[in-house]
Amino acid sequence: MRLRDDGSVPDDNPFVGRAGYRPEIYSLGHRNQLGLTLHPDTGALWLHENGPLGGDEINLIRAGGNYGWPVVSYSREYSGPRVAFRTWQEGMEPAEIVWLPSIAPSGMVFYDGDRFPNWRGSLFVGALRTGMIRNTGHL
């Protein structure tokens, strides 16, 4: 969903005027998105999602992108079977990072400080399941 500060829909939202879609939609095919951050240099929007049983994802969000849930997934249902029978499909955006088993991502931030220059541009992701902060490296 993408809105202006006053709640109105930007004219350049990717689904404005498309039959069968609400104009507020910016991207679709998400399951349980809990964390968003902007890349400090590019301004790109990054999102993390929790899968039901593994298949947690980091996604680079593109206008109008379809991220596949539940058609494509690395996840399993809590009862055991796979959510989907494929992990990729043409026309759907692949995840940048997938965790198996689940780490239960709980927030993320790009490091853009000066104290640790080797970490500049690295994405750090909090993990509820392991109690760790994971460095994904430079993205």
Please report, for each region that a protein language model flagged, where it lies by residue.
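Beta-propeller domain segments
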Residues: 1-139
